[in-house]
Amino acid sequence: ASETYLERLWKIFKQATGWDGQGTAPASVTLSTSFGAGENHLGAVGGHTDIIDVTVLMTLHATYVANDFVGLSGVPLTFAGCARKNGGTGLIVSAELIDYALQSVAGELWLFNTPIVPPADSAAWTITDAELLTLVCVIPFSTYYASALNSASPVGNLTYPFKCRATSTSLSGAFVTRGAPAYNSGDVTFRLGVLQD
């Protein structure tokens, strides 16, 4: 019968070390159980869910009109840590818009795998063709659940795959209103649920 892989490996080991495995190994035989990591940590193999909150700061914090960009002029939202490692992948599984101002107006969160340059705050939502090619998804918010002071629009059962840039674990975002809310800076928080590979 032919040798198995392990039998052949043992034979090579004995020839290289001169040790037959009986008794204590001679000092010339060094056994190592260390191995190099494929990443900076061991043990995480994916399937980890994370919740990432980002509050929208605004330059003008005014009354917006339908189809306006809402945020800091020329500055996208950054959802840091969406992936486990640089260039990592995952799924967006849920999103929630928290409205502290109780405006409860329809809007969208646009997510990209590369930082974009949005228009000025309260300007018409516009992006370039090149930026559109980096689009991961658009998450609409239209149904709100309100208290006397605030409201929330949760969206579940999402399955949007993403892949971050080679040097990043983040996704870039932009908030677009489809109504006419009156927001102050910090009145809106997005909560993103991600399943990391």
Give a label for each model feature:
Residues 1-103, 176, 181-197:
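Extended, low-complexity segments enriched in Ser/Thr/Gly and acidic residues that occur primarily
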Residues 99, 104, 118-119, 146-148:
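A broad, structure-centric signal for solvent-exposed, well-ordered loop/edge residues
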Residues 108-113:
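Beta-strand signatures of extracellular beta-sandwich domains
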Residues 128-163:
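Extended, solvent-exposed segments with strong compositional bias
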